[in-house]
Amino acid sequence: MTKWKRANPNGTRDYLFEECTLIEEVEQKLRRTFLERGYEEIRTPTIEFYDVFAFQSRPIDEEKMYKFFDEKGRIIVLRPDMTIPLARVMGTQRCDTPLKVTYSGNVFRANESLAGKYNEIVQSGIEVIGIDNVRAEIECVISVIQSLQKLKVQSFTIEIGQVQLYKCIVKKLSIHEEEEKVLRTYIESKNYAALSNFIRDKKLDRCDETVKLLEKLPRLFGNLEVIEEAEKLASSNEMKMAITRVKEIYEAIEKLGYGSYISIDLGMIQHLDYYTGVIFKGYIYEIGEEIVSGGRYDELIGNFGEMLPAVGLAVQVNQIVKALQEQQEPYERKRIDIMIHYELNRLAEAERLRNLLQKDGKKVALSLFSNLNDTFQFARKNQIVTVVEAKSESLVEYVWKEKWVVQKEGETSCVTFKLR
């Protein structure tokens, strides 16, 4: 029964020291940026009832969820998504809208073994609830761009898509559910040959404007020229409105000077079925992995109560950390500047001195050793160059200069004893 006691479950790992500190810093910088832009914080439980994720459209595969039973035999899951629990809160609580919220937490999904994906990831995100207005999408994109800038993430782009356009095409061509799942993979993977064969096998009329748009969809990525091309083939007002929405968002963000951070991809289709309109994905060129995802989900909150429009974006913290590690010098955690060695009867004095010295921005720690030589050895091993000894009647400062030498000796009052 102890076979796995030294191992981590598949898709999980331990984060140590420098990397753990970097994850925390990324989360805090994201949080600070979002709060400065007027977002309110919200937290939901790490565990949720299975029913929260099991509504009709089943946006998350049951096989992807970690399930177990509570004390009453009810099915509980580790949350596989942050947006759906937030929708539960918005649908069951009375909140004034429009409302901007931010969150951060761990998400758990059982990915296939050897797929190269982690089953536990950290997400920080934002949601704009209660307003169906292009300003909400613009606000989300601006917030994420500014947060990535403050993190000094290099070479990133936010792609803007429109799942409503794809849904209009599927509806107009009467493509049923099972066929649609296959079609979706062809378009998402930009598999032009497979898409062409699909159109042939379905005996769709290639002269029809909607079929032409379907066949071109995977190729419609780039700048505003993509919009112009799509508009020519749009065969309904609903399609035209969907395309115009993307155009308005792109133009507004471009005018702010953020044009180099955005692009259009009308062939992008999110795998989560609860998205109803504009969708987003963000990438960093160096790692080629998704760092941002989200979109508009106007029907999701209605599964839990009042129907409320909403749009949001999630930032994949682990991928941001990976990118920062690759594009910057190796991150080094702040080392201890001063170590205080003390006799037990001088603990109060040592702690007062520690509090005094850290006010100057120094990192100060109390020694865990009872023997001064052990403290010296630990200090050398960890590149600590200053040790202060709190003796019975005095304080002694030692500095490493090829050996430990006394730098200063003074009174026991840490008010009068000052280091360099």
From Swiss-Prot:
Subcellular localization(s) per the UniProt record: Cytoplasm
This protein's UniProt keywords: Amino-acid biosynthesis, Cytoplasm, Histidine biosynthesis
Entries under Gene3D superfamilies matching the protein: Bira Bifunctional Protein, Domain 2
GO cellular component: cytoplasm
Keyword Glycoprotein: no
Alphabetical list of Pfam families matching this protein: tRNA-synt_His (PF13393)
InterPro entries xref list: aa-tRNA-synth_II (IPR006195), aa-tRNA-synth_II/BPL/LPL (IPR045864), HisRS-like_core (IPR041715), HisRS/HisZ (IPR004516), HisZ (IPR004517)
Pathway(s) it belongs to: Amino-acid biosynthesis; L-histidine biosynthesis; L-histidine from 5-phospho-alpha-D-ribose 1-diphosphate: step 1/9
Single GO term (MF): catalytic activity, acting on a protein
GO BP terms in the entry: histidyl-tRNA aminoacylation; L-histidine biosynthetic process
Purpose: Required for the first step of histidine biosynthesis. May allow the feedback regulation of ATP phosphoribosyltransferase activity by histidine.
NCBIfam families attached to this UniProt entry: hisZ_biosyn_reg, PRK12292.1-6
Extra information: This function is generally fulfilled by the C-terminal part of HisG, which is missing in some bacteria such as this one.
HAMAP family recorded: HisZ
Family that this chain belongs to: Belongs to the class-II aminoacyl-tRNA synthetase family. HisZ subfamily.
Subunit structure: Heteromultimer composed of HisG and HisZ subunits.
PANTHER family from the UniProt entry: ATP PHOSPHORIBOSYLTRANSFERASE REGULATORY SUBUNIT, HISTIDYL-TRNA SYNTHETASE
Protein name: ATP phosphoribosyltransferase regulatory subunit
Organism field: Bacillus cereus (strain ZK / E33L)
